[in-house]
């Protein structure tokens, strides 16, 4: 996750916005998912060349952890597929404005096998939740190959899309100020956003019935709804209270629980010293 955030910041705010530079940077993600893998000069095509070994250190920590992953062979192909899609998204969404949209939507049309709207599919590729969940289960080799496949199909694109649409939803004003791409801007109206979010939730809930700990994965979506919508950044977005209420109702009482507790937490953070 630290690698993901660090590379996103480099792409967002760096001086070099070439495709080959972004791809070279994201080889760190590939190497991090390869136990006993190589490390290389991830800054090869960038102006900035020296981070004091920081990125290589992060890669090494991930590689060392994955050596202990007993079920790695079963999840390797899924990890690299998710990583490839994540990398492609990061590359295309950070290109120059005059070529960004064309390359991004061409890529989406080639990869999207789920009949999802372009922006929804693109959003789903931007989450790393599937990678984390696969590794978490398979550190002790807990799942069969069939169960691994079912878990992958639950998270991509449905849980991941649900996650990132909420993330983009609360970041709209921040992204607008920074000139960053935000997939929520591509919805025609609030209703279209709600419909997309509900569809992802509905599909994921169905697929969760076919995986181990299905109720846990649904609970994660309920938690995401409550936690994201309670974020103080929501106040900066121009939308109706009715939409907020309608979105929260997707997760029913469970999301309300997380929402109310997160609101209390944020209030305490802003009012208590230290």
Q: Where would I find each of the regions flagged by the language model?
A:
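Glycine-rich, phosphate-binding/catalytic loops in enzymes
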Residues: 20-23, 181-182
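Active-site/pore-lining binding-face segments in mid-to-C-terminal subdomains
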Residues: 149-225
């Amino acid at each position: 996750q630290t690698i993901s955030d660090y590379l996103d910041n480099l792409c967002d705010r760096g001086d070099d916005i070439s495709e080959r530079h972004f791809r070279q940077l994201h080889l760190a993600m590939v190497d991090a998912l390869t136990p006993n893998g190589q490390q290389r000069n991830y800054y090869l095509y960038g102006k900035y060349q020296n981070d004091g070994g920081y990125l290589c250190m992060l890669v090494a920590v991930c590689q060392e952890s994955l050596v202990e992953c007993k079920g790695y062979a079963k999840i390797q192909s899924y990890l690299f597929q998710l990583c490839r899609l994540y990398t492609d998204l990061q590359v295309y969404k950070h290109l120059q404005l005059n070529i960004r949209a064309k390359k991004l939507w061409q890529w989406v049309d080639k990869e999207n096998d789920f009949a999802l709207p372009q922006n929804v599919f693109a959003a789903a590729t931007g989450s790393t939740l599937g990678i984390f969940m696969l590794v978490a289960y398979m550190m002790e080799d807990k799942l069969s190959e069939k169960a691994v496949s079912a878990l992958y199909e639950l998270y991509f694109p449905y849980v991941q899309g649900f996650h990132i649409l909420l993330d983009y939803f609360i970041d709209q004003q921040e992204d607008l100020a920074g000139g960053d791409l935000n997939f929520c801007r591509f919805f025609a109206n609030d209703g279209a956003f709600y419909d997309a979010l509900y569809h992802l939730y509905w599909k994921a809930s169905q697929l969760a019935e076919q995986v181990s700990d299905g109720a846990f994965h649904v609970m994660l979506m309920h938690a995401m709804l409550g936690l994201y919508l309670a974020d103080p950044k929501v106040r900066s977005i121009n939308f109706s209270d009715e939409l907020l209420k309608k979105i929260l109702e997707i997760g029913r009482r469970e999301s309300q629980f997380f929402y109310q507790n997160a609101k209390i937490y944020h209030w305490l953070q802003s009012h208590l010293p230290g």
